[in-house]
Swiss-Prot record:
Domain notes: Lacks alpha-helical transmembrane segments, suggesting that it resides in the membrane via beta-sheet conformations similar to those predicted for other outer membrane proteins and porin. The SMP-LTD domain is a barrel-like domain that can bind various types of glycerophospholipids in its interior and mediate their transfer between two adjacent bilayers.
Gene encoding the protein: MDM34
Subcellular location: Mitochondrion outer membrane
Compositionally biased region (Basic residues): 360-373
Keywords, in A-Z order: Lipid transport, Lipid-binding, Membrane, Mitochondrion, Mitochondrion outer membrane, Transmembrane, Transmembrane beta strand, Transport
Function: Component of the ERMES/MDM complex, which serves as a molecular tether to connect the endoplasmic reticulum (ER) and mitochondria. Components of this complex are involved in the control of mitochondrial shape and protein biogenesis, and function in nonvesicular lipid trafficking between the ER and mitochondria. MDM34 is required for the interaction of the ER-resident membrane protein MMM1 and the outer mitochondrial membrane-resident beta-barrel protein MDM10.
Record note on quaternary structure: Component of the ER-mitochondria encounter structure (ERMES) or MDM complex, composed of MMM1, MDM10, MDM12 and MDM34.
Gene Ontology CC: ERMES complex
Main subcellular localisation: mitochondrion
Top-level taxon of the source organism: Eukaryota
Record flagged with keyword Transmembrane helix: no
Protein's UniProt name: Mitochondrial distribution and morphology protein 34
Keyword Transport carried by entry: yes
Organism: Uncinocarpus reesii (strain UAMH 1704)
């Protein structure tokens, strides 16, 4: 089975093209148009070309003399073209590029009406491919339905081809509109054309209906500059009468476009006075200061009005100081006020938040130097005459010669002249203990023996060894009736002191010996042995005195045992 398509009669019939153009114009204006197109779309030229489409029969469902139904595969790559004409809006503020909401977009009054530009579009180089269902009947005409989207590509040429963005936009929009046209509008257009050809009743019915007048041309455009507004005003806002407007001309020196409408001036005033938020015609709110208008000067004035914010610098300087617990045990004469001293042991807390004002006041304030009340008991560099201060401070004694022995020093050999006395030793200051202070307050007299002149001789090897092994520095004697040289400090180690205390207790059990002196020693003993015996007698007498004071209960109270203990030895001489 074969079919013969005669494409040339369609090209030769002038009435066919006219009817097809009218139907295409109605179909293009039926669907909603994009906002950039502000006028109707008119089909000014239509040509089917000389190349017919290619059809391939896939299925034949019904075949008779007056009807046919079948499925075809169609492909078209001919030279048909279509020319459209319309007008588009050239206002850039009202185009497809706007993506923000309308309430947030400014709408200047100068471009509210929009500028329209004529646009001519030519569609050519159609590429179609799809499946077509064809139904033919002499009583009902021809019905063509596309099962898929047949449009593959086409070429769009317009007056804005020099602008790439507009060209691409028109290409996309027209392709979308043609796809809708092929699927929805083209089958209806073909059906109506077939009815005119084969159904005489439809042709007579259509001839009785008057055709609607379609404007062929729009004529010359009106010059908006020569048509003043209804309520014209000049640049100063003064209303103009009709006589003044009539007297104006293009040659009068006053241009017509300087006339503004009073309504437009009011809108411009509202635009100027608006807060520039949301819509431009938002009514202003009284007694409201927007944050965009508040600067540093306004913030400074707000802070000086008497209302302090929580983070203001004035509050960040408020601090509370907590002193260390050790400061309560210090001497009252050496403790300074907390406001004049800042130490590392003190903890400071902010008065309003822990981090307010941190790092602003890092420089420490100048403070007074803390006084140190320390008595220097060490040696003096210059040898002076020693002075002994009694407990009551009544008198002083000076010793001309006093011998001091130390375990760390070895005595040098003396000169050949045994008469020459050595230099006076350094001063040894000994503060009386509390026992001596109490005994002085009770009226006890402490006898001071005059200084005893000692001469050195060449010591023997055994005596020197004994002296070095048992160091016995001299101490003042605090016993009654004992003639001992003053300013001789006796310092024992812990092991020697314990052994001597035991021996002293044994001697005190037999009774005190107040008559003990250095004269009891053998005359043949050496001078060093006599000095050592004198020191031992002084220590025994002092221990006896302390025991007697404890028996007499001179120190009542819970601290008497602590007070009665032997005071620590003085600094090394």
């Amino acid at each position: 089975m074969a079919f013969n398509f005669n494409w040339s009669p369609l090209m030769a019939d002038a009435g066919f093209y006219t009817r097809a153009q009218d139907l295409l114009t109605a179909a293009l204006n039926k669907s909603p148009k994009p906002p950039i197109i502000v006028d109707d779309i008119a089909v000014t030229e239509l040509n089917l070309g000389s190349i017919p489409p290619e059809l391939e029969i896939l299925e034949v469902g019904d075949l008779a003399e007056d009807r046919f139904r079948g499925i075809f595969k169609m492909s078209y790559s001919g030279d048909a073209f279509l020319t459209l004409k319309t007008r588009v809006q050239a206002n850039p503020l009202n185009t497809f590029l706007i993506t923000r909401p309308a309430y947030a977009s400014p709408k200047p009054l100068a471009a509210a009406s929009g500028l329209t530009i004529p646009l001519q579009i030519t569609l050519s180089n159609f590429r179609l491919s799809g499946f077509v269902v064809l139904v033919f009947s002499k009583q009902k005409g021809i019905t063509v339905v596309f099962r898929n989207d047949p449009l593959e590509s086409l070429k769009v040429s317009s007056t804005f081809d020099s602008i790439p963005s507009v060209r691409d936009y028109l290409q996309r929009e027209i392709e979308g509109q043609l796809r809708i046209l092929f699927m929805d509008e083209l089958p209806a257009i073909i059906h109506r054309l077939s009815l005119r050809l084969w159904v005489p009743e439809y042709r007579g019915l259509e001839a009785g209906i008057p055709e609607t007048a379609i404007p062929s041309s729009l004529g010359p455009g009106e010059d908006t500059l020569l048509n003043p507004p209804k309520d014209p005003v000049d640049a100063s806002g003064n209303l103009l009468s009709s006589a003044e407007i009539a007297s104006l001309s293009l040659d009068s020196g006053v241009e017509m476009h300087s006339l503004f409408s009073q309504k437009n001036l009011l809108r411009l005033a509202a635009l100027t006075n608006s807060q520039r938020t949301l819509s431009l015609f938002t009514p202003s709110i009284r007694e409201v200061m927007f944050r965009a208008r508040t600067g540093l000067a306004d913030q400074g004035e707000g802070l000086g009005s008497g209302l302090m914010s929580p983070g203001s610098p004035a509050l960040s300087r408020t601090h509370s100081h907590i002193s260390s617990p050790l400061s309560s045990f210090q001497d009252s004469s050496s403790v300074l006020s907390l406001q004049q001293r800042s130490t590392t042991a003190a903890s400071s807390f902010s008065g309003y938040g822990l981090s307010l004002g941190a790092g602003r006041h890092t420089k420490a304030r100048p403070t007074k130097k803390r006084k140190k009340r320390v008595v220097d008991l060490r040696k003096q560099s210059k040898p002076t005459d020693p002075e002994i201060t009694s407990a009551d401070g009544g008198y002083t004694e000076t010793s001309t010669a006093s011998t001091t022995f130390s375990s760390s020093t070895v005595p040098e050999e003396v000169n050949d002249d045994p008469v020459t006395p050595p230099l006076s030793p350094e001063t040894t200051i000994r503060f009386p203990n509390r026992q001596h202070r109490f005994s002085t307050s009770e009226g006890k007299v402490i006898a001071r023996a005059p200084a005893q002149q000692l001469t050195y001789s060449e010591p023997s090897h055994s005596a020197l060894h004994t002296q070095t092994a048992n160091p016995v520095p001299a101490v003042p004697l605090h016993a009654e009736g004992a003639a001992v040289p003053p300013q001789q400090a006796l310092v024992f180690g812990d092991e020697h002191l314990g052994s001597r205390e035991k021996s002293m207790e044994a001697q005190s059990s037999h009774g005190p010996n107040p008559g003990l002196s250095i004269t009891d020693a053998a005359p043949n003993s050496s001078i060093l042995e006599q000095a050592w015996m004198m020191k031992m007698a002084n220590e025994i007498a002092r221990r006896i005195q302390e025991q007697n004071s404890l028996v007499n209960n001179n120190y009542p109270g819970p601290w008497e045992q602590t007070r009665a203990r032997t005071p620590p030895p003085a600094y090394g001489q």
